[in-house]
Amino acid sequence: MFVRRLAALVGATALGLVAALGLVAAQAAPLRTAPTPDVRAYLVPVAREPGLTAAQRLALVRRHIKYVFVLYQENRSFDSYFGTYPGADGIYSRPGVATPGFVQPILNTDGTLGTIGPFRIGPAQFAADTDDVDHSHDILFRKMDIEAGHALMDHFALAEERKYSPHGKPSLKAKQFGELAMAYEDCDTVPILWRYADRFALYDHIFQEIVGPSTPGNLSIIAAQTGVTQWMLHPAAAWWDANHDLGEPVANDADPLWGSPRDPTAHKIAVNAHDFAGAHPYPIQLNQTYASLPLTLAGRSLPGVVTQDTRAATDLADVRQDVAAIGHGGHAAVDWRWFEEGFDHEPTDSVDPTDATGQHASYITHHNGPQYFGYIANNPVMRAKLRGLADFFAALKGGTLPAAGGVFYVKGGYDNIFGLKPADPAAAVQRRFLGDDDHPGYSDAEISEAMVARAVNAIAASRYWKQAAIIITWDDSEGDYDHVPPPALQYGPNGDRISDGPRVPLLLISPYARVHAVVHAVGNHASVVKFVDALFALPPLASLPDELEGRKIGRLRFHQANLGPEDALTPDVTDLLSGFDAARLSGRAAPLPPSYAETPARLVDRLPAVTGYGCKALGIVPVDAQLGIHTTPPADFNPRPKTEPSPGGHRG
């Protein structure tokens, strides 16, 4: 009843806020979406673009692409990073009254009702270093505010605020966290990412597959699910409280069983020892037993590979039919790696005094998707595919990646191996925001995009560039505001929607990518799996017999058609192929040179907040600026209410 009363009051003030921002009149002006001059020379005229069927496009992509690099970052909604990118479906793409969640309720510290809309933060607020807003399943579900099956996207501020002050007047900290959920950044904070969007293909309708935090995203990027098949095959494994229960489908950040104190094996896989120290150790998840890309990538060698599993009876029980089907499929094995900072020795081990445990101290165990699967962790052949971040750069420099190609996931961690420091001189920031995987609360956004740029530069400088597809995307939306209601694909054991969640950015970089393109195709994390399936002619995970059995149970018992991997048989999941340029694929235009993808070292080695590199230098005018909309943070805004509690924090 309280929430409904708030909604009514917000509706009464919405038009006033929209008018104050000047949206109704300003949006009549046409937006400037043309590429910058250095990009314009690489545009292919429409007249030179051949018409290709889907089959022809796929055949050409298969001819040209052998290496897939997935630079997998953490915790950013599309609107929080690209909501004002010209040409994208963003915050100001339509009048505020037609934009879901544009005006939201927030409680003032005196208990009165206020309203809040999205607002820009930048270098003046040290926007590269923000605290972590809540993105657990329960609170993200509340933020989406689903009524009658439709996500209203209008409780991002209130649900965040109520986490810290569930009843009565909110504390200042609670209100500041609610405000933080509505902040967005642009090319003055992450100019390198905007540079990639300007030069290559930006997808603006990719959703996080699961409503929840990081672990689900790191499972779905290799499995196109987080355990709905396991839930169907083992109903007793289901959770009822997604935030606190172990179980299927995975919707929280419990650590993998393998490597944990409960791991029964003699040769334990890597783990960050901090996870199980102190009074509040990480919970430990169930062994994951459904199919993932590492199985289908093994091809006809899979029946032999799985004989190396030291706990085959339990690890393989739910994929026996899958293994046989993949083995009989006849395709050759495709190699893969998961490179994650801290998994093995890194150059920075033991350097930072906060990393007292040395090796694995920068490792974020619950971000390593493959480690959750016993058939990977307990199989020395599979387990050998898991490496550290420095190993990735060494492999590129040494040219030691497999000659036949493969799929290579790349992730940062709690630290950064290049010794970069945040631009904000505050002691707490210098101590706590050294990470490079873009996760608020410990990563610096500028350090994180520098890591991505180093990875792209290294690929561009390597022998692999001419056959590469680089996908940059994020594992979840952080709990930050995004205005686009996600498709409704799956519902969990307690009836909550679990798929899809809010949008995340996705960028495609390749010699054959479209230039200065915004791709509106709808998809989610399973789109990456679907692309890999298509490129290497793998059987979709959704087509495997054990997964089909789970889907059948879902239809009969739960009356849901999509309880299985989402890389096939599920609507609204693109294969990403529309981001490739038909003219370049067919030879009517030259492939993009490596220099076009490279970011100059002067922009990578020094952070934008130091050099001043941003929108003006890029030559990009964000949509809000084009429309004459100049938002300011609330008077009591604090980008770090937890790290630096204060009445105001950094304001600008």
Task: Report the location of each language-model feature.
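Bacterial N-terminal signal peptides that target proteins for export
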Residues: 1-13
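Bacterial N-terminal signal peptides
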Residues: 10-22
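N-terminal pro-sequences and low-complexity stem/linker regions of secreted or lumenal proteins
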Residues: 28-652
